[in-house]
Amino acid sequence: MTLLQPYLPRGGVSASPYSEAGALYALGLIHANKGGSGDSTVITFLTNALRNAGVNEVVQHGSCLGIGLAAMATGNPELFEDLKGILLLDSAIAAEGAALSLGLVLLGQADSPLAQNNIPELLTWAH
């Protein structure tokens, strides 16, 4: 995270939302598929960035993509609910990132109760 630190959100008002969103996405790429290894520092950081993004849909988009990559194939129900909450907002930009990330988090989890209970509902939202 040291390399990306100047570009990552620091809380408060975003000076450059596109740089911050790109840095959050890059953080997810760097830590892709490591979410199940026990170290959840990056996922926690990305989740906090998502929650602190407020109505900034660009930062929400980058946070969602970062979460999806870092938590790939974990089937984490808390992350699923956070991403689903963004998906149901009236923002096409943020919802696109959330939808892609939901697929990444549920990767390989098709038989899990989380997927079985939620996929039919998610398909009703598909356009």
At which residue positions do the language-model features occur?
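Mature, well-folded catalytic/scaffold domains that follow N-terminal targeting or propeptide regions
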Residues: 1-127
